């Protein structure tokens, strides 16, 4: 099948993404027809589905390369696969913690913003002070506890 057909079979992966995956080495270069069209077989589709699922789980390109190498290696050690997964879980947990901290901070700031026609706003002050490299003054000015 050609690249357009492959992208339809593997939903969520555009023709452009398939070319990109080929360029960065996630998938092997496709065979070409006499008129230089890419041709994909069942193994290529299976690999694209593997890449898409790994991407859906949030793995980085480098992690996907590692997982593909392990997937292709029939003598692999499952401990290596588990190590990649555990590293990714730890990374996701760090991101979740950072997002939770941002959410808490924004909720706190939003609760102290009057949301009326006054120009004073702890949200803007917090962002402006952080952009200036200053310690946020929103806490002192608006009587907020430390964030």
From Swiss-Prot:
- What are the recorded GO MF terms, alphabetically? copper ion binding; DNA binding; DNA-binding transcription factor activity
Tell me the ranges covered by the HTH merR-type domain, including all copies: 1-70
Which residues form the DNA-binding region? 3-22
Pfam families linked to this entry: MerR, MerR-DNA-bind
Q: Which SMART domains match?
A: HTH_MERR (SM00422)
UniProt key word Ubl conjugation? no
Q: Which InterPro entries match?
A: CueR, DNA-bd_dom_put_sf, MerR-type_HTH_dom, MerR_fam, Tscrpt_reg_MerR_DNA-bd
Which UniProt keywords are present, listed alphabetically?
Copper, Cytoplasm, DNA-binding, Plasmid, Transcription, Transcription regulation
Cellular component terms, GO, for this chain's entry? cytoplasm
Q: Which Gene3D superfamilies match?
A: 1.10.1660.10
Task: Give its localization.
Answer: Cytoplasm
Q: Which GO terms describe its biological process?
A: positive regulation of DNA-templated transcription
Q: What does this protein do?
A: Transcriptional regulator involved in acid tolerance. Binds copper.
| Record note on domains | It contains a N-terminal DNA binding region and a C-terminal metal binding region.
What's the protein called, per UniProt? Heavy metal-dependent transcription regulator 1
